[in-house]
């Protein structure tokens, strides 16, 4: 009994003396694997040189990150250079025409001649004589849209189709309904409208941009569904494509801060600075909804305004962009901009084509 009392007393004495020892000595007396994590890390830091060693390690890590970043940039630049080469890179096989490609190109002159050209034009005219079956849209004779919904009945003239905003608000729902209940005619209308839009001149293309934005504003204002199968909505991308082509030389100088490719790709409302950028961004936002396969364009696809396209006035695309061309022509320092803007507005041939050589017909 006395021995057990003495042993318990000695253990208490040792534990008390252990607690009175400095923390570093107590931890140092334990095996490394039994020390707390913080103590082990502290010991490692002390062995590596304390705070000075930590700064050196941070500098080393920073140098390694910089080296890795430089290597990634060099690899990216090397890949871009290889992609820009016609042969695809130093290890790619020689870039040359295959024998079948040579034969196909050489055989063109034996297959195509004056007779063949006349035949294909006649065939195309025949196909366009009946572009749609089931009598097209079959609009009632009393409908204000009956004449314009005919296929190939008459040539389009802007003044012949001019309507007021009030007239559109009154009769627009009827056209919207016909686009929905005549799917076969609507499909043909989408195809033909796209072909027409891609072949328009600048003035006609700007009027088509106004037609698109006016229609979108009308449908959303009336609370109707803006379907992406609607011929006017579905072809917003064609309007945008043709405008970028017709305005391309002007836009390269006019949009120096934000190139048109970047402007259209980002489609950000905060990039809008004028009617030119407004038209491009709005058409791009509509076209994007169509491209991703959505069934309809929602008001929030065009912005967070409680009134869709509240700031847009029908005709702003045509009038505003023509005014921007003239203003840029008189204000730009580039010596060629005067010619560029003038020809964009009035595309009459003056110079540029030098010969025409045709051994086929």
From Swiss-Prot:
GO terms for cellular component: host cell cytoplasm; host cell nucleus. A zinc finger (CHC2-type) spans 253-337. It holds the Pfam family Herpes_UL69. One of its GO terms (biological process) is regulation of DNA-templated transcription. Residues 16-36, 80-99 have a biased composition (Basic and acidic residues). Binds viral intronless RNAs and SR proteins through the Arg-rich region. This is mRNA export factor ICP27 homolog. It comes from Suid herpesvirus 1 (strain Kaplan) (SuHV-1).
